[in-house]
């Protein structure tokens, strides 16, 4: 029998490159909208103050007269964290095989331990992203007047759409509600595409700019400190890829949370975080 290439390799099939085919994932932005609390406990008591410092009082007094006393409202609420978990089993024999291949430097090999850990991490991250997106794009999450539904000629993808007017009006609504201007605009992939090519947006650009508006230009035009584009996708039961964030835009004030106390991990679960973190959003539905 004539010897074949497989016989020369003793019928082994080495991995000849360091490449591994697989599906990638877009940018996940859940923590940009609902930041994790630096909290390692599964239950926490959160203090909440009233709006006393935003109200006006009659502070005028006669010499020696009584001063105005303002009582601070304090509300303490206890929140618990739900747990999520996933298993990606990997036979011990395969782990040992990869371990020995690495020690013996037998060509390239699959780092199955890393693949399993990355897969589990990505699954948990996508589940978190989906839950946050469902909460943030639900009209029932917001107060009356804080959701703008666009259709037909008002859509940002339409030539007559007015995203600059919409975003600036939404920013003013948030400012009047909480006393702070929104600092973050979260855009789905579709919303970002429509916004960058919108005629009203391009009218703010120099005449020398022929292409779509960049993120930096959009930040200046819309007067928003940060713009994040949500590219994450998920595959449904029909094997169809779908955008996690649909065609939505969410304008919000997101507080900056430092890791006070040196905590470097968080057990916070998306739904609990939304209730824990004080913020105000106005959703713009494209």
Q: What kind of region is each of these model predictions?
A:
Residues 1-38:
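N-terminal alpha-helical "arm" segments
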Residues 10-13, 37, 56-57, 257, ...:
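Positively charged, low-complexity intrinsically disordered regions
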Residues 23-91, 118:
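Assembly/oligomerization interface modules of large self-assembling protein complexes
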Residues 92-100:
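Acidic/histidine-rich, surface-exposed loop or edge segments in extracytoplasmic proteins
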Residues 99-181, 189-204:
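Alpha-helical scaffold segments that mediate packing/assembly in large oligomeric complexes
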Residues 122, 215, 276:
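Short, cationic low-complexity segments
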Residues 180-272:
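Extended oligomerization regions of viral-like shell subunits
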Residues 274-286:
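Single conserved hydrophobic/aromatic residue that forms the stacking wall/gate
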């Amino acid at each position: 029998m004539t010897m074949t290439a497989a016989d020369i390799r003793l019928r082994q099939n080495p991995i000849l490159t360091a490449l591994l085919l697989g599906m990638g994932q877009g940018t996940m932005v859940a923590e940009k909208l609902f930041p994790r609390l630096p909290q390692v406990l599964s239950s926490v008591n959160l203090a909440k103050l009233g709006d006393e410092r935003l109200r006006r009082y009659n502070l005028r007094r006669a010499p020696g007269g009584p001063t105005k006393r303002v009582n601070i409202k304090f509300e303490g609420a206890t929140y618990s964290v739900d747990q999520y978990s996933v298993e990606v089993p990997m036979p011990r024999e395969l782990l040992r095989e990869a371990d020995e291949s690495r020690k013996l430097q037998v060509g390239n090999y699959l780092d199955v331990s890393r693949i399993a850990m990355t897969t589990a991490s990505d699954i948990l991250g996508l589940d978190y992203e989906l839950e946050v997106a469902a909460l943030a794009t639900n009209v029932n999450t917001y107060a009356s007047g804080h959701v703008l539904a666009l259709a037909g000629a008002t859509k940002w993808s339409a030539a007559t759409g007015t995203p600059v007017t919409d975003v600036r009006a939404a920013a003013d609504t948030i400012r009047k509600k909480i006393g702070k201007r929104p600092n973050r605009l979260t855009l789905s992939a579709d919303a970002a595409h429509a916004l960058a090519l919108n005629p009203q947006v391009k009218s703010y650009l120099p005449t020398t700019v022929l292409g779509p508006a960049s993120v930096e230009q959009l930040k200046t035009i819309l007067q928003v400190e940060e713009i994040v584009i949500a590219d994450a996708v998920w595959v449904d039961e029909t094997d169809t890829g779908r955008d996690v964030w649909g065609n939505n835009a969410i304008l919000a004030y997101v507080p900056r949370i430092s890791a006070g106390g040196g905590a470097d991990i968080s057990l916070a679960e998306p739904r609990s975080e939304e209730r824990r973190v004080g913020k105000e959003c106005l959703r713009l539905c494209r």
